[in-house]
Amino acid sequence: MSDTANPTVPALAKSDQNLVWLDCEMSGLNPETERLLEIAVVVTSADLTLRVEGPVFAIHQADAVLDGMDAWNKGTHGRSGLIDKVRASTVTEADAERELLAFLSRYVPKGVVPMCGNSIGQDRRFLVKYMPKLEAFFHYRNVDVSTLKELAKRWKPEAYSSFKKAQRHTALADVHESIDELLHYRTHLLAV
């Protein structure tokens, strides 16, 4: 989790050029009626070569929230073990928000780095409702890998089809997969 606790994790200096990657697993798609189940962050260097994993939280939700999920969410989050983790968790959204802010403040200044991920606007909608301080920590801009995915599908289908997602649907795995996907598109679509 921390680069000081684990000597195998490379040191990453605090910088406004670092990127913060985030993923949430939710009970559904509507932040007005659904809730956050899991959240993870990874901070990378600007060139994506260094990665520092932040805390990963399964967020406790009432049985009514979990029982009210649709079949896709029940199946996906049941297979991944997330439903059991959420039931067993004592972490609230406020607890997770506080810990994530403390972690991020070690690597990036407030208000200047974009939120990075896949379809990150959806995660941001949930953060506005349930973790507004965390959402406000980020710049209003996003680095959304799904934009490149949609462009690759139309402009360079071989770049699109050559990246295979594992579809694990756990927050930390999805964050790493988003970073890997951006690296893929940087090479095969953007030629940077």
From Swiss-Prot:
Statement: the UniProt record of this protein carries the keyword Transcription: no
InterPro entries documented for this protein: Exonuclease_RNaseT/DNA_pol3, Oligoribonuclease, RNaseH-like_sf, RNaseH_sf
MF (Gene Ontology): 3'-5'-RNA exonuclease activity; nucleic acid binding
Limits of the Exonuclease domain: 19-182
SUPFAM superfamilies in alphabetical order: Ribonuclease H-like
Nuclease in keyword set: yes
Subcellular localization, as worded in the UniProt entry: Cytoplasm
One Pfam family here: RNase_T
Keywords: Cytoplasm, Exonuclease, Hydrolase, Nuclease
Active-site residues from the entry: Y140
Documented EC number(s): 3.1.15.-
GO cellular component assignments: cytoplasm
Main subcellular localisation: cytoplasm
GO biological process: DNA metabolic process
Top-level class of the enzyme under EC nomenclature: hydrolase
Similarity-based family: Belongs to the oligoribonuclease family.
NCBIfam families: PRK05359.1
Stated role: 3'-to-5' exoribonuclease specific for small oligoribonucleotides.
Protein name as annotated: Oligoribonuclease
